[in-house]
């Protein structure tokens, strides 16, 4: 784990216990990181970044050297992944609030094909607990609270794991211009939590 990199979205879908069913419905795991340059990977020749797991995925799969996002801002890029549409068609031309539901949403379409889809990590949707076709979510919204009754799943977990510690004490934010080593135990990092929750979801489905 690169400790100053936050995982924004881990989607697990098609987690089927039946081998025959799984043969027809392959498992799908989509991992999306937040605010990461395309060359910030060891497999891209960047010696400053240690990313063995992502490097292995790239080595065993397909590495797109000319792939690009239709919008470099996080929320419209996420809306593009969710809907398969360009910013001009899903309606988010820049950073801001997206729709609470879109006409076409990938998790809902997977559900129509009998997949069980679940979203884990930073969603940055509005409302914050919107499902967008997922059967359920576990969200990390950092300190962003847009309704008085909301607290992110990561924050609840952090309070149980590290009572008395403040997750904001690292002073590393999503939109900061600087980077730093995570000062708390690595197991408390949002990316570590996202990965562990995704693995637990797969194990227990």
Q: Model-derived features: where do they sit?
A:
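Formylglycine-dependent sulfatase
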Residues: 6, 15, 19-205
